[in-house]
Amino acid sequence: RWADIIVAARPGVGKALALDTPLPTPTGWTTTGDVAVGDELLGADGKPTRVVAATEVLLGRPCYEVEFSDGTVIVADAAHQWLTETRASRKSAQAAAAGYNRYKNQRTFAAVRTTAEIAGTLRCPTLDRRLNHSVVNARALDLPDREFLVPPYTLGAWLGDGTSAAAQITAADPEIIMRIEAEMSSTVGTLQARLRTIGVLGNKHIPTEYLRGSETQRRELLAGLLDTDGTVTAGGAVQFSVTNQRLACDVAELIVSLGYRCQTSTKRVRGRNESSSIAYTLTFSTEKKMFALERKAIHKERRAMAGTTRSGSRFIVDVRPVETVAVRCVEVDNGSHLYLASRAMVPTHNSTLGLDFLRSCSIKHRMASVIFSLEMSKSEIVMRLLSAEAKIKLADMRSGRMSDEDWTRLARRMSEISEAPLYIDDSPNLTMMEIRAKARRLRQKADLRLVVVDYLQLMSSGKKVESRQLEVSEFSRQLKLLAKELEVPVVAISQLNRGPEQRTDKKPMLSDLRESGSLEQDADMVILLNRPDAFERDDPRGGEADFILAKHRNGPTKTVTVAHQLHLSRFANMAR
């Protein structure tokens, strides 16, 4: 029988950051308070990622200051999620790299944890009480080449050792001078005129467009800075010192944008005035070649890294409760759901029931189904399906750290999964007209028996409309007509507003359906998802989820309790 079914849940259950948290973008910076749906942020993989959902401002939530080993402090709510490694997972990763992770205690890897969970396990339960959680550095920003008036290396050399008010470079090293002359020989106009045009003459700083150049261009810029004013420590770390605070901040951003952890220290020096009496020293570690100047590159190689510093990640050194502040949630469209936050560019985190419907229809009962996914990519959906069917942790699949037992389970399920009549369409900006046309073709071609749309709030009509509520109402009516025309169930995933969070019991109601009351009116069935342990980690019903059948046009309403196995991307019946 055909039916129009709405499945609704809260978006992310409140993974929120303070409104003033800086967020890097492909063109500069924004904040959690200013970012809007459709804007681009940067993911942990260094690539631009689009904001697909952003909540209203949330008040009265328990908040924490999360402090990292490089001095970065981020204010987040208790439910905000971080992808962290623990002492156990770091040992497991080392075992995996060495090829002997065959034991259960060597199969724990990085996992998503809330701020509250990290606060409770901040230090290891060992005699030395060492720090437990670390966050792996983001990859170097992956951005396109730009056209620059001043070549990046030349700008870096001038910023490091040039006269602020003129185009004079005081470096005596002939290798640097020869490279600058070679770069400027093919340009028209003087270096001084070009420095004035980009706004740095008399005001030393790195223009934003240079900080968002390609990785190669940013490495050339940093090489110019280090060749003129960089040093190497006894342990092989790279240092850059300057008394210009703005330039120090810009160079720190440049270093972080290349995927390195940057530590900043200060000390008093004898300067001409107060503003030049503080020296800022930036320190970072890498095995890569950072100097273009041959003698410095050789010197760094000679002072090889001692290997005692964990330079690929930041440790969380403290998680302390603070007074509640206004916070906001952001959701991005990349597969890992990670985006960068703060000036240090720390990676931070951001639907399972719809996939359970598909698995039951196509894999268990061999009937054709289709999901039109506006949120997740095809590869992400397939990975979640494999995780759920083979009962393998999604985090292990993503990281490529599956055990021999995991591979065996996956191999056993692959033939059945690969033969399932399951169709996935992750086309961007799908309209209702396109969904109807594709669903009709599948009905004729493969005897389609189920349609899932994930999710309604990401759909667009492609037309100018008077209000978003009217647009969602039209989607609701069109889905109803589609279900009736094809005579198949149409399951539409929807978001709830933040109403449940204001109630004592946190349970969702029909009135919480987001952006349109038409969803409630048009649907034959509405299922609301509720997870008691989403707000209270120590809730006695931890691990349970409620499917609240809030509307059923042709039958009774009821609440069904199931077990959530989110690490396996699935819900399961409760054990009896």
Swiss-Prot record:
Its EC number is 5.6.2.3, 3.1.-.-. PROSITE patterns: INTEIN_ENDONUCLEASE, SF4_HELICASE. The main replicative DNA helicase, it participates in initiation and elongation during chromosome replication. Travels ahead of the DNA replisome, separating dsDNA into templates for DNA synthesis. A processive ATP-dependent 5'-3' DNA helicase it has DNA-dependent ATPase activity. Coiled coil: none annotated. This protein undergoes a protein self splicing that involves a post-translational excision of the intervening region (intein) followed by peptide ligation. Homohexamer. This is Replicative DNA helicase DnaB. It comes from Mycobacterium intracellulare. GO terms for cellular component: cytosol; primosome complex. One of its GO terms (biological process) is intein-mediated protein splicing. Residues 313-576 form the SF4 helicase domain. It catalyses: Couples ATP hydrolysis with the unwinding of duplex DNA at the replication fork by translocating in the 5'-3' direction. This creates two antiparallel DNA single strands (ssDNA). The leading ssDNA polymer is the template for DNA polymerase III holoenzyme which synthesizes a continuous strand; ATP + H2O = ADP + phosphate + H(+).
